[in-house]
Design a protein with these regions (language model features):
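Conserved glycine-rich cofactor-binding loop
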Residues: 5, 12-14
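Residues forming the Rossmann-fold NAD(P)(H) cofactor-binding site
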Residues: 17-21
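Conserved catalytic-site loops of classical short-chain dehydrogenases/reductases
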Residues: 83-84
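Substrate-binding pocket helix/loop in short-chain dehydrogenase/reductase
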Residues: 96-109
Length: 110
């Protein structure tokens, strides 16, 4: 069965988590993605129980070049149709620019 989903990146905290909850409250099925499997699992169970929706997750670090393919393959293998994409994942450096290393700057730009 092909079921429509909203895919939310950076879904374990902050704006991403709030958006996932709001979409779930509207009856949307959700695919969560972030780096922390423990939080993804907890949130997935919570959204299913509270809003009676389908919810799944894929662990992915969008700073890695392979992450989009991993997410795409996960959705494809499970026959999930992504009808809404919330590209929320982000990375910040809590330093002044002149104090950052080249590695930190490269990670930030990805």
């Amino acid at each position: 069965m092909n079921t429509k989903y909203a895919l939310v990146t950076g879904a374990t905290a902050g704006i991403g988590l709030d958006i996932a909850k709001e979409l779930a409250s509207q009856g949307k099925n959700i695919i969560l993605t972030a780096r922390r499997e423990d939080r993804l699992s907890e949130i997935s169970i919570s959204l299913k129980d509270e809003f009676n929706i389908e919810c799944d997750y894929v662990v992915a670090d969008l700073a890695q070049f392979s992450a989009p393919d991993k997410i795409y393959n996960f959705c494809s293998e499970n026959n999930y149709i992504v009808e809404i994409l919330v590209n929320n994942a982000g990375y910040s450096i809590n330093k002044k620019f002149h104090e950052t290393s080249e590695d930190e700057e490269e990670k930030f730009l990805r």
